[in-house]
Each structure stands twice: as C-alpha cells, then as structure tokens.
Amino acid sequence: IVSIHTRDQRDTMKIIKTFYLKFPQFRWITFRDMRGINQEEFSEYLRDAFVSVWVDDTSGFGTYPLESMASRTPVIGKVPNMKPDWMDEKNGVWTYEANNIVDILAEFVQNWLEDNISDQLYDEGLKTASKFMDEDKFKGTVAETFQNYINVRLENFEGQLNKLKVEEVE
C-alpha cells in the first residue's frame, strides 16, 4: 500500500493515473488517499503502508511526513515552497519537481522489492520525527491512565472488603 497525501484530490489522481500508465507492471500496488480520514484510521493506514507520498507546495508545515517517519514509513515528497529545517536527504526522498514523484516512486518500489532500501532511511526518519514528538507527555498520560485504573480497582476492592467486614461484625 502506498499512502498518499496531497492538498488537492486532482493531484492525487494525477500521480496515481500517471504511475499506472507509465509502470503497468506495478498495477498490483494499492494507493490510499489519506485526506479526510479520522485519526485512528490515519495511523493504522500509515503502519500498513510501505511508503508515503507527500505533495504540498503551499505548506511546509504539514505534519504528514513527520507522522510517516514516526511510524517508520519512508517518505517520498516534493519540497514545498517554504522548506522546513528538518527536511534533508537522510530522512526521506525529496524532489523539487512534482512530475518526478512517479519515477522516484517506481524506482523506490523496485528497490523495495529487491530489498535494497537502507535501514538508515528508516532510522533517520524516526530520529527526525522524534524531535517533534512529546514522548514524555505521552508516557505521562499512559502512566496516569494505568495509575488511575489501579486506584479505581483498589477502591472497589477495599469497598467490597469493608462490606464483608461489616457483614461479619453484624
């Protein structure tokens, strides 16, 4: 599965149609448009994808490439008009021409099939994304959730125990 995120659906369709026309041997590849889906499906689809495609000229502040990198999904993308600081050749495959996306994607697919994708691409992407992730906040939230769960269970247990003690005394 190739997850794809563009600003306009026409751009998405242009990439997909051009890819299938130019490389019919890859007709078995499924594309998934990532615009307008809920957060749970979004993360699920990113995990299932073997590569993400991002084309957005207008915004250099889109989080889609970072979310892809965080889920260890390599990114192929067009460099936006305002290039973000985190975007470099180590953490993704970037081009200045949207027309090159299809050729780069085909080459990436071929390398993926031949198992020629460097682990460095995955590692650098995760390293880049981790700069923007608040892991401590996430860990704190998870720890608090489990502690609250334990406290509620403990209160229920103590309540049941106190009821039994009261019944014994009577």
What are these regions (language model features)?
Residues 113-168:
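A charged, aromatic-enriched C-terminal amphipathic alpha-helix characteristic of glycosyltransferases
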Residues 57:
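Aromatic "clamp/platform" in nucleotide-sugar-dependent glycosyltransferases that forms part
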